[in-house]
């Protein structure tokens, strides 16, 4: 794996770093909220289930951002659109910490969702179109580990600073990702595949996607719905589960979150690289099925140590499956709409899974506050569903980007 990364040119490494950090910091801004659900509920004199509507709104708005920023990236380029998007979600995160009421807070989280939705598709397209085809599996795992890396940063911030700055200060720290724009501006060039076909008409890719690639797009949406239910169903309410059902302290919750995000990072790296050898679908199936024997320890463990071990293994498997996604979706994407197709399919899946936190909170309340039961039920059903969809789905492992115009070995444009 390391020799593949060393083979990248400075510009290719810059694109990978920018895309990884963009997704890391986007996820950091999102996951700050899951650690302070209870605090926000207390601040605005409501319950946790009501506050989870902010998560629903954020996830539901992400397809809008994926579509708008994706279309803009297909028209104006990946690099400038990525910079605008990062600035926007950073500013909205800061503003969330200033919200004077629950209504304003919900509106800001809705707007944040639009900005959050734009980052993944644009960043992944920039990286995948810049690197050699033979490194896609490894880089895919790296890019997707940005998500648990962001969660890990949020957990560390919560553990170290929450007692000093409170929930509002946690959100205000979320403005720091804006500094990444300076790195992109100075170190990252535009995707060579985009430059080879620049100046496409704005919105043309969407029409073609819906007309000519409807079946492939619908499959990608179904696949990403299962992926998002699995991810959000094992992550978003886990801190609340530890706080409300097990009554663990802030420090204990933060430490467990740090542990399971290390598992997520390792899983994403391993399965991303593995998918280059055994194929995208097979890697997804193996990782999804690995979650099933872990569920009893992850959801029904009694001690902090047992739950930490279960959570580590669960996120190793969940994010292992996710480590394949950037390469898989970009390879499935039609050539002239790679800025739009992967991110839009991903975020439509997010929209369809956006009620997960509210659904799980409702199941828990209906069962006497048993969050473990709610988490286990959703995780088991969705893991099997994902494995079936991946097994019987389609794959375009190793497909060349930009036809004959981009060299698959070094990413350079060919005439």
Regions flagged by a language model, labelled:
Residues 34, 214-265, 353-357:
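Extracytoplasmic gate region of multi-pass secondary transporters
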Residues 34-64, 251:
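Extracellular/periplasmic helix-loop-helix junction of adjacent transmembrane segments
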């Amino acid at each position: 794996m390391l020799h593949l990364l060393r083979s990248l040119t400075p510009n290719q490494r810059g694109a990978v770093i920018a895309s990884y950090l963009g997704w890391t910091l986007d996820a950091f801004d999102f996951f700050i909220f899951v650690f302070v659900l209870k605090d926000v509920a207390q601040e605005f004199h409501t319950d946790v289930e009501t506050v989870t509507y902010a998560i629903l709104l954020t996830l539901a708005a992400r397809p809008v951002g994926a579509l708008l920023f994706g279309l803009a990236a297909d028209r104006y380029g990946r690099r400038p659109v990525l910079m605008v998007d990062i600035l926007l979600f950073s500013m909205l995160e800061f503003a969330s910490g200033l919200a004077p009421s629950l209504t304003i807070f919900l509106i800001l989280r809705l707007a944040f969702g639009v900005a959050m939705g734009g980052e993944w598709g644009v960043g992944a397209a920039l990286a995948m179109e810049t690197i050699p085809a033979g490194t896609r599996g490894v880089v895919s795992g790296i890019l997707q580990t940005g998500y648990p890396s962001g969660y890990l940063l949020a957990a560390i911030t919560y553990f170290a600073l929450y007692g000093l700055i409170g929930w509002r200060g946690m959100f205000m720290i979320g403005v720091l990702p804006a500094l990444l724009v300076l790195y992109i501006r100075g170190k990252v060039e535009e995707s060579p595949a985009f430059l080879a076909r620049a100046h496409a008409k704005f919105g043309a890719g969407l029409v073609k996607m819906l007309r000519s690639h409807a079946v492939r797009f619908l499959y990608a949406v179904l696949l990403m719905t299962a992926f998002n239910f699995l991810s959000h169903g094992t992550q978003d309410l886990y801190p609340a589960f530890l706080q409300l059902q097990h009554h663990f302290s802030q420090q204990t919750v933060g430490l467990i979150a740090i542990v399971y995000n290390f598992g997520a990072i390792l899983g994403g790296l391993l399965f991303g690289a593995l998918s280059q050898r055994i194929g995208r679908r097979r890697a997804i199936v193996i990782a999804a099925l690995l979650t099933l024997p872990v569920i009893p320890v992850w959801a029904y463990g009694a001690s902090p140590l047992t739950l930490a071990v279960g959570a580590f293994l669960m996120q190793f498997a969940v994010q292992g499956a996710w480590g394949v996604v950037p390469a898989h979706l970009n390879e499935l994407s039609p050539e002239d709409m790679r800025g739009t197709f992967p991110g839009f399919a991903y975020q439509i899946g997010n929209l369809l899974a956006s009620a997960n936190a509210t659904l799980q909170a409702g199941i828990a309340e209906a069962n006497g506050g048993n969050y473990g039961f709610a988490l286990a039920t959703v995780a088991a059903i969705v893991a099997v569903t994902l494995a079936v969809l991946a097994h019987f789905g389609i794959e375009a492992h190793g497909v060349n980007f930009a036809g004959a115009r981009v060299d698959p070995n070094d990413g350079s444009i060919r005439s």
